[in-house]
Amino acid sequence: MAESRSDKRYDDQNDEERSSQSTTPVNNPNKSGDNPAPAKHRPVGPKTKTLVRSEAYVNGKLSRPAFISLTILTFITFVGNFTQLQLSSALPAIVDEFHISVTIGQWLTSVFQLVMGVMVPLTAFMTRRFSTRQIVITSMLVFTAGSALSWLAPNFVLVLAGRLLEAIGTGVMWPVLQITVFSIYPLDRRGMAMGTVGLAMSVAPAIGPTLGGLQTDLSGWRSMFLTLTIIGVVSVIAAVVGLRNFGENDPNAQADFFSVVLSIFGFGGLMFGFTNIQSFPLIHPMTGLPMLIGVLGIIWFVMRQVRRQRAREAGTGTKEPLLNLHVLANRGFTVGTCTASIAFFAFSSILVVMPLYIQNDRGYSATMSGLIMLPGALGMAIAQFFGGKMLDRFGARPVAILGSSVLTIGTFGMSLISATSWIWWVSICQFVRQIGMGFVLMPITTWSLNCLEEDEVSAGSAVTNTARQIAGAMGAPVLVILMETFTAMRHAALGGGAETAALANIFGIQWVLRVSGLLCLLMVVIVVIGVRGQGAGTAHAIGRGALRKIRSLSK
């Protein structure tokens, strides 16, 4: 039933868009019986007024207010992604200045990921309760305060507190940007829009650590937070001046604060435990206890949301759930969310494992490691853009099959590394992998959200981003532990000793890559079997398009 409603809505909305683009404006001065003048970009009232789709997307193009607003949101979200990764290059300098251990210093990056993971489930309520301007301006004020605090902090605790505020400020921005794109663009143009946004987002991991290291070397780590403070102030001013509201909100909506608490302890506890699993044993109080609390909290959270939703649908209750999990009843959305989560789980570990191979086992510098991995990040940015355009033209199914297959081939190819491999083979395989990731991740996410009703997109965005955050947080530590297990077994088989340590470690990395490849292969199967229905498309469409292109060139 969910798919049939989505199919009908897909056609109805396209008709609505065509109708809205040919309708005479309300204040059209043309009083005669002649054909009305084409719709033009027209004033849409004060900045606090909600910009509806007929005003934001006119004659197949963004109106000026919508373009400015989307640019501001994309820039702010980019800053959030950039901030998350920028500090990794400055950790040695911070550790030296405050005389702390590397493990403690790592919390500057861990707490950012942890807080962002906690914030994402709350975005569904926030977008329901507050307007776009209220959310964005408040978030950037919090971000700016956090950046200033870290810049001026006399001790590590205040630097960490500033990072926490930065994460709170930026944690909601990606879901807000997704929801805004879906409220502006019609169904058959969302792939291109999300691909363009994904292009901007993918640049952040490519340049974040590099620019962070360069700025730290030139002017010290505090200059990074000074720069972010200035960017925060500029972003607040830009949002106040140029940002419009999108989508409807209910100022009277009430939050279920007990669900908020369950969400924080559930998702936060689970991610906290997995973050520590590389530093402590599984049964240690810093890992096992938070993970147990997290699992119990998530189970309680899910049961409470389902119970409230059922009571509301049955007319026996009026209180809304904090997060509408009914979206998981939609087959297309669930398939897309599972696919994206598997991709994050399998992909995140490689970003941890391969630098170990390049630096520890092959003896290359950290700078060289970054250069080897850099082409892949740029490839993913380009692939997300073209993947979005292909989604609009051919549908999600052929694009996702292509992407997941390329990702699988690249992963198994990378598993062929050895102690004497050409080092740029890693770069080539990572480039292939991230090309595949770009072609599968954004199209499958866009398609899965397209399967939902308009009023379910905010909940769907929160659910899918939460699942991806958890999968990413779990993937790296789980596969690193698997690598260490294979390494220990191989080291013992080789008789132990320092001279065989590197060979044993490479053996462990090879098997982790093979396991990751099997997960990618599972993703191919899920896409082939599960991605169906309106908007999914077929491989025949690509074939017909290619044949038409060949015939036109031969004439």
PLM segments and residue spans:
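Hydrophobic alpha-helical interface/terminus motif in multipass membrane transporters
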Residues: 91-94, 180-181, 215, 243, ...
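Intrinsic disorder in cytosolic terminal tails and internal cytosolic loops
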Residues: 1-65, 530-555
